[in-house]
Amino acid sequence: MTTMTITPAEDFVKAAYQHGIKDQKKLQELKNRYSLQFKRSPFSNIELLKAYRELISRGEMTEDRDFFKVLRKRGVRSHSGIANITVITKAFPCPGKCIFCPTEPRMPKSYLSNEPAIMRAILNDFDAYRQTLNRLESLYRTGHHTDKIDVIVSGGTWSFYPKKYQTAFTRGIFNALNYPAPKARSLEEAQKINETAANRCIGLSFET
């Protein structure tokens, strides 16, 4: 007979649940006490969410919406039930000559490489599919619902990108939202699949 070993994070989650923790302040107090008692650094919310999900999957805990909200990190991002994902287009010549507009090499016009969204885009080579999938995974890890997604496309002047690039970029977004379904070959097909996907696009805006 195999004995399941409980991890420190799972042990903490069980203790927090048994203590009836219902707000971030009480959770942090328990984190601090646990940290002092066991001489370890405090658990991150991501670690606790992973442990919570594992305990539920093994049938050792039942789902509790209020407790889940306490463990979830940065709840304001999806407080309305809609999660936002920003995807950045690659650098492309802009016809504008605005004096105040930054023109950093290899960056979309008006954006700087030290901005969080741009840094994520750089890590994903400005690929729409990879950026979207990366953000979905991040949202899931931090406890956010991803069934309703509002996508914002930022970057250079969208209307001056080649039509082929516009279509491929947008298709990449939908293909990522449709994962793990196979990638669609056309934008129309990707949009159709997304109508019944787990991560549905309920809004798509181009802020360029």
Model-derived regions: residue spans:
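Extended hydrophobic secondary-structure segments that form protein cores and membrane-embedded regions
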Residues: 150-155, 202-208
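Flexible, acidic/Gly-rich N-terminal and inter-domain linker regions that tether
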Residues: 1-118, 122-131, 135-181
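Residue-level signal for functionally critical sites in structured catalytic/ligand-binding pockets
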Residues: 77, 195-207
